[in-house]
Amino acid sequence: MTLTKWALPLFFLFFYLLPLDQRPLWSPDENRYAEISREMVSTGDWVVPHFLGLRYFEKPIAGYWFNSISQQLFGDTNFAVRFASAAATGLSALLIFWFALQLWQCRRKAFLASLIYLSLLIVYGIGTYSVLDAMVTLWLNAAMVSFYIIRKEGSLGSRIGGYLLFGLACGMGFLTKGFIALAVPVVVIVPYVIYQRRLLELVRFGPLAILSAVLLAAPWAIAVHLREPDYWHYFFWVEHIQRFAADNAQHKAPFWYYLPMGLLGTLPWLGLLPGALRKGWQERKISPETLYLLAWVILPLLFFSIAKGKLLTYILPCFAPLAMLMAANAVDLLKEGKERAFKVNAWLNGLFGLICLVVLAVLAFSPSHAVYGEEDQGALAVAMVIFAGWSLLGFIQLKEVSRRWTLSALCPMVLAIGLPWALPQSLIDSKLPERFIEANQAVLMKSGTLLANDVGLASSLAWGTQRSEINLFDSKGEVHYGLGYPDAAGRYVARADFPAWLEQARKNGQVALLMKTDRDGNTGPVPTADETIVSHRLTLLIYHGAQ
């Protein structure tokens, strides 16, 4: 791979931006964020987040702002929904390039750090997926980079400006995802400055960072409090304390959860990981920058491992410094003529592709584990081509590995290009209901009232029909809080109340109920519909209006 100034921009263009519009939105996350921002644009309310027309206090506002601006620029498209995440990832890669250049004065290390970062499986997956983690990671990366730069000796004015900038980055992180965005800088920087015996400097200048962060966040924080006095109570206690520390925390997982998931996320560069960490540990006492990067990787990982609530996206901030450590070690190994790590990495990619091919074969031909049905033969073929390509890209490096090792960056890109055409219909109906909704758009648009028995389905309906008032049937899900307000009365229909409610609703026109059923297609007890449309686990019940 030739090192040119166009390589990274072209890589980002072809493998990040161009595929964004090729696959439907995944439920529930992408539909949720798409719909929240669509409602923000349509209502003009840029202060209080709403979802399905209901108050939704799960996150602060900045991520929704960026998504809404994207929709204003690019329309109600899947590209627009994902653009903010992709753009944030690209800016993180640019920041990594600049920071690596400052640390090592080596363009090759800077280039490889950015390339490795962009092609990490976890970074690519989250960076082309509409969630807030790529955006908050950008602000955390900016905060961590700015702090390391200002820790160097400089004039009083430059230090003051640097700490103010550090605070602004932390403030944007807070406005994007809340208090948890402040945890990463704290758990890394405080131990680091104590180890470096520079705690007094942090005590002297740290309040400036706090001041700039508070001044940045205060206008919206005050505005949302004046509009919705319960916002901060719910956001702090439910979305932070209960999610991360309480016994009933969301997404509970064992302490070691991030170890296997993190290793998988480092593909296609897993073979470079042990050497990078080992060298970082060996150089921690003689290289301040290496110690800083190592702390940036390990301490947030430990923090999120201790928390009871865990999601893979939480550890995304650990991968910018990890990419830099791997790139620096790779360049040093090449200078020393050592190829073992690159050969191991090539073998790992080759074997990973082969293992995935075997798993696909089992899923395709085992009656008890079948995922691909008779109608999915084309999708199965594409999936096999994807992992055969991944394997081939690994094995062809073994000849002249010192020249070809960067081909590993293309492994996830084969997956990125082929994925939209490799999904079985059962998965599409379960996780990508957009296609089913598009196929039944006419009958849905004729319906005066729309219901769904799942919040993810409701958000898909809202996005697909451009209607926010989708009623919830039999399950309140993540909007239970918003449904508790008096002005949301009537937005939820219990199963026991459905027959009587339906009789009244049909007087105002056609009613459509979209349901996600169990694997046997059971809808449970509901009145017999005038029309029934079924596709795998999706069932659409149409009740004509009363004559």
UniProtKB/Swiss-Prot annotation:
Chief location bin: membrane
Entry's localization field: Cell inner membrane
GO biological process, one term: lipid A biosynthetic process
Any one cellular-component term (Gene Ontology): plasma membrane
Transmembrane domains' residue ranges: 83-103, 111-131, 174-194, 205-225, 253-273, 286-306, 311-331, 346-366, 378-398, 408-428
InterPro entries: ArnT_tfrase, Glyco_trans_39/83, LipidA_mod_glycosyltrf_83
Matching Pfam families: PMT (PF02366)
Annotated keywords: Cell inner membrane, Cell membrane, Glycosyltransferase, Lipid A biosynthesis, Lipid biosynthesis, Lipid metabolism, Lipopolysaccharide biosynthesis, Membrane, Transferase, Transmembrane, Transmembrane helix
UniProt function note: Catalyzes the transfer of the L-Ara4N moiety of the glycolipid undecaprenyl phosphate-alpha-L-Ara4N to lipid A. The modified arabinose is attached to lipid A and is required for resistance to polymyxin and cationic antimicrobial peptides.
Family: Belongs to the glycosyltransferase 83 family.
Record's protein name: Undecaprenyl phosphate-alpha-4-amino-4-deoxy-L-arabinose arabinosyl transferase
